[in-house]
Design a protein with these regions (language model features):
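Surface-exposed patches in mature extracellular/periplasmic domains of secreted proteins
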Residues: 71-82, 143-148, 171-176
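Active-site neighborhood of HAD-like aspartate-dependent phosphohydrolases
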Residues: 73-80, 91-124
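Substrate-recognition element of Asp-dependent hydrolases with the DxDx(T/V) motif
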Residues: 89, 129-163
């Protein structure tokens, strides 16, 4: 996950620690509003916009259509059916984490806070996710979760606990893969594809589909590559909305979690104004 700018708007958002039994930091008085509010706007959009939710519903509806078609066409001799999905911002969302950062004056992604947030199970199911995943189970389609995280010792158990806390199907060691040392999901996805007929892949980052999209400091090349593969989106790849973080940031900064520096702020500004009239 990545970075965020400060806004007094988030003072109305409840701290994600409520009911978790874990205190991360008190949501102090909201910080002064700054002129730069691009990422704050993205966080507000994620927390309030019906359009944000509609995009999730749309994605899961499309995926379910392909699941139903695959089930109807499957023959006994065929490989079993499966869906491969990312976790974060695909089937689970972290609005409370972003709200916490803003309420505490954070302007960029904060790893220590993220690592404290994860074990609280304060995440939420993405709109439509639970219904879709349960539909897969009802149809006999297995779901494999492939995610990349690193909270140190206990990383895997935390991720598994996140899924189980939300009542997700297939939340077990057979179906969950947590990559700690790499974000390259292709090797694991290929292993799954050897035994299963993978209907669709779901993710919020292009890197969730193929490693070739993980391009640093060249968002134009990444956009071009996406255009070349346009027929895969909505058919084999189901992309979910995420304006606050993802590998698209690495295409600008060279890393997915750039530090809060004057140089990086200047690059944000330069990139945001590149098409100004």
């Amino acid at each position: 996950m990545k970075k965020l700018l400060v806004s007094a708007l988030a003072a109305t958002v409840l701290s994600f620690g409520i009911g978790s039994g874990v205190t991360i930091a008190s949501a102090a008085e909201p910080q002064a509003v700054t002129k730069s509010n691009i990422l704050t706007m993205a966080a507000v959009w994620k927390q309030t916009a019906a359009e944000y939710r509609a995009l999730y519903y749309q994605g899961f509806n499309i995926a379910q259509k392909y699941v139903d078609e695959a089930v109807a066409k499957k023959k006994k001799k065929d490989k079993p059916l499966a869906v491969i999905t990312d976790m974060d911002d695909t089937v689970v969302i972290h609005d409370r984490y972003w709200a916490h950062l803003i309420a505490n004056g954070e302007e960029f992604f904060n790893d220590p806070v993220w690592d404290k947030y994860i074990p609280t199970n304060s995440l939420l199911p993405a709109p439509g996710a639970l219904e879709f995943l349960n539909h897969c189970k009802e149809k006999g389609v297995e779901v494999f979760y492939v995610t990349s995280r690193d909270q140190g010792e206990g990383t895997y158990e935390m991720a598994l606990g996140n899924l189980q806390s939300l009542g997700f199907p297939y939340a077990d060691k057979e179906h969950l893969t947590v990559l700690v040392d790499t974000s390259n999901k292709e090797p694991r996805q290929k292993e799954i594809a050897e035994k299963y007929n993978v209907i669709v892949k779901l993710g919020d980052s292009l890197n969730d589909f193929q490693r070739k999209y993980y391009i640093k400091k060249d968002f134009e090349e990444r956009n071009l590559m996406t255009a070349m593969d346009k027929d895969l989106f909505g058919t084999k790849y189901i992309i979910m909305p995420n304006p606050t973080d993802g590998h698209w940031i690495a295409a600008i900064f060279g890393q997915s979690e750039p530090e809060d520096t004057e140089e990086n702020r200047a690059l944000w500004q330069k990139t945001a104004t590149r098409n100004a009239w």
